[in-house]
């Protein structure tokens, strides 16, 4: 059988190629506004609390809709605010997303992108869903496909095979943390690179997109 090559997770050379003048300007602008953030936080505590509640609801709704999971706006707000129990499979997945999002908001400073942490978050994501394989990597190969106007499907890209997923996730997390701790590359460049590599691995049968959103929030 032909050997399938592993992906190369490069957080040293590749970032330099991404630093176009436009990206450098955007990164600099983000850092500049972050420096002004503390004064705004101190002066607008109540307003920011309201904005956070709205953001939690909108993030939960948007991420789940991408996965084909829907409920009414009223039920969504009740589920995210923990004022209601899930009634069906869709609402169970929404409740799981809420739990992971709460974990990240409350402890993001202590959450590192390590395989065991990512597996735990995935388990929490499906903690309300009976029979779901939360906390385990995919057990079969998956293909990201697209359908044209005539209904024909073709592969958009082929993720890492199931048998290489564990090794790929270990390598991805190790290389990312090395670059993060070395602090030679701007973290605003490293984060989207990690997210893209994570999606290219597509390590789970389900739940890859919600976890991608939550990793962005944690970062």
Whereabouts are the PLM-identified features?
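FIC/Doc superfamily catalytic core
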Residues: 1-219
